[in-house]
């Protein structure tokens, strides 16, 4: 299963960090203990709201209580936990306040992510609304040092354990720092979330030398930047693998 896969990844020479992005539903205490034993470097929980009805509408099932229980157990055993919240059209101030209340006294990162114009998503930067809320309601401090390997920029709030991060792929490009590629659920290597071009890797499974060669060549073709601002992709994130 995936736990065995993660353990093997951690043991590979040259692999410096392995993190997991998940909805958290199946990460019960036993699984969290095994992830701790594997040495997982971080777990990102995708949680867009703490309203159980809204959560069920987004995810298709009412599992929020289980997800939060799993998250809190992960925190209790010392795992590096981040919460990723996409600021979509249904995101409200009530959602924001609930997330702050939940995370405030936890040693976690709460990151607000700009909705990318994929599928039917519209171009609107609601991250600015979130940033304005923090600026007007809290005593905040910009964190100048880099936290982790990702593109988020962070702030601290006085008297809170959590740190707050913002990721704005469209309105504050970070393409010049991006060193990521994505393997889709269909076995294709995407060099950029937006670009339509991808490289099929399935034909090379079983030939490790050729597979490595194709992947190395592909990485050198990574686009210099995305063009979300010019046109909209019809692809949705769950088709890509995120």
Per-region residue spans from a language model:
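Auxiliary Fe-S-binding modules of radical SAM enzymes
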Residues: 101, 105, 115-242
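Radical SAM/AdoMet-radical enzyme domain recognition
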Residues: 1-113
């Amino acid at each position: 299963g995936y736990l065995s896969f993660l353990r093997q990844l951690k043991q590979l020479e040259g692999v410096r960090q392995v993190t997991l992005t998940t909805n958290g539903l199946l990460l019960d205490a036993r699984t969290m203990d095994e992830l701790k034993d594997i040495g997982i470097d971080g777990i990102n929980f995708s949680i867009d709201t703490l309203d159980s009805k809204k959560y069920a509408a987004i995810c298709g099932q009412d599992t929020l209580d289980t997800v939060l229980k799993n998250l809190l157990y992960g925190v209790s055993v010392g795992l590096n936990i981040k919460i990723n919240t996409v600021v979509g059209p249904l995101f409200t101030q009530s959602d924001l306040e609930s997330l702050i209340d939940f995370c405030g006294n936890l040693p976690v990162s709460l990151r607000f992510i700009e909705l990318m114009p994929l599928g039917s998503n519209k171009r609107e930067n609601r991250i600015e609304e979130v940033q304005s809320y923090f600026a007007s309601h809290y005593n905040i401090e910009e964190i100048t040092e880099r936290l982790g390997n990702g593109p988020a920029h962070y702030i601290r709030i006085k008297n809170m354990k959590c740190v707050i991060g913002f990721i704005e792929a469209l309105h504050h490009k970070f393409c010049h720092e991006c060193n990521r590629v994505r393997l889709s659920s269909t076995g294709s290597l995407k060099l950029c979330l937006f670009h339509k071009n991808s490289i099929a890797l399935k034909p090379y499974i079983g030939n490790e030398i050729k597979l490595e060669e194709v992947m190395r060549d592909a990485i050198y073709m990574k686009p210099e930047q995305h063009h979300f601002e010019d046109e909209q992709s019809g692809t949705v994130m769950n088709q890509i693998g995120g």
